[in-house]
Amino acid sequence: MNCRFSVRLLLLVAIAIPARGEDIRQLARSVDDHYNHLRSLQADFTEIYRGEGAERVESGTLWLKKPRKMRWEYRSPKEKLFISDGQAVWFYLPAERQLRKTTLKKLDDLRSPLAFLLGKTKLENELQGLSKVVDQSPLSPENTLLRGVPQAMVGQANEVQLEITPSDQIVRIVLLEADGATTEYRFAGWKENLELSDSRFQFTPPPGVETVEGQLGP
């Protein structure tokens, strides 16, 4: 290889590597800024679980509100309800007439990180080794796919992937779990800064429903 060409190539590589890192940091800061300035969110979601040779697809509507309030209404293939008022968490299965209850601090659930989208988010702190995914494609070609190791989910998830739109919205979250399974959340129809009553994030069980204190089910 020509010596002069080699030197130019090395210089280009040296310049490009930090530039890519800076691009990722800038994107992370833009996403942080977007979500840190929101009060509330609503979206349709699809949850896809793959593990042990099986696939489970569920869908419904999600609401998020500061601070750390969330409500997941599953409608398909069966109804269930997952609610947090910022402190307590309820998981209700109407078909089984059973309510499971715990606290947000004790929650061991893959849905919990989404509550912090409306906290003081800083992706570079929450996802160690944040980098661009180059061996996979985003669902939409104009989006960017990032990956990192989740600091708050040690022992649960080995990696989190975020698909981000040009307008800094997170439209897909993929969690690669420690046991080899994957849980994927896809979001559509985002509505931001809605007026959401706190009552939407409260739950009173119907009469005759069994309440179980402790960890929640799937």
Regions found by a protein language model. Give the residues of each.
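A generic structural motif
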Residues: 46-50, 73-75, 92-94, 149-151, ...
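An acidic-aromatic
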Residues: 61-113, 183-184
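N-terminal leader/targeting segments and the immediate start of mature chains
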Residues: 17-56, 69, 205-218
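Gly/Pro-enriched, hydrophobic low-complexity segments
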Residues: 125-208, 212-215
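Sec-dependent signal peptide recognition
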Residues: 4-12
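Flexible, surface-exposed loop/linker segments and immediately adjacent secondary-structure boundaries
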Residues: 97-142
